[in-house]
């Protein structure tokens, strides 16, 4: 359910670059705390690497068909938004799962009490607390700009992505 419902919800909220529901990991089978953290880092790291590859393509592939530039630029921004969103250090996000193996059991128990509602609190905060969404999108803007994004192309890509508003 979450693999389909969450992506549609995120698209309706304006295209935040998130995949579906989380993948279950049997953490008790992984002996090293560092490996547990590394597994949780794999998702955001893959989004970051993909964003870097897109940035390199946009910057150093001069013969690319110009019609692809808006879509690739927008996709890069979606990847950066996925990195930053998933690194939020609250459960059930990857940012928390990276830290979780190193937390004291009492602290983990306190966080686990709210695991089921935290995502909704974060989404509501993004929706209703301008400071939080502004801070997030400023981070997305800054990291994307470091990768050389042309924001005129990003806006054009967003407009094409939201085809239902045309």
Predicted features along the sequence, with ranges:
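Hydrophobic transmembrane alpha-helices and their immediate loop junctions
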Residues: 1-166
């Amino acid at each position: 359910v979450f693999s389909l419902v969450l992506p549609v919800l995120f698209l309706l909220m304006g295209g935040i670059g998130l995949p579906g529901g989380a993948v279950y990991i049997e953490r008790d089978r992984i002996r090293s705390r560092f490996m547990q953290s590394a597994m949780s880092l794999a998702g955001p790291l893959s989004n970051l690497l993909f964003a870097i590859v897109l940035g390199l393509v946009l910057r150093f592939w001069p013969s690319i068909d110009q019609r692809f530039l808006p879509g690739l630029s927008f996709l890069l921004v979606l990847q950066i938004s996925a990195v930053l969103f998933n690194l939020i250090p609250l459960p059930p996000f990857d940012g928390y799962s990276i830290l979780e193996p190193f937390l004291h059991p009492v602290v983990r128990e306190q966080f686990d009490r709210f695991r089921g509602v935290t995502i909704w609190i974060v989404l509501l905060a993004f929706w209703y607390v301008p400071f939080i969404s502004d801070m997030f999108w400023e981070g997305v803007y800054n990291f994307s700009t470091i990768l050389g994004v042309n924001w005129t192309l990003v806006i054009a890509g967003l407009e094409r992505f939201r085809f239902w508003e045309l």
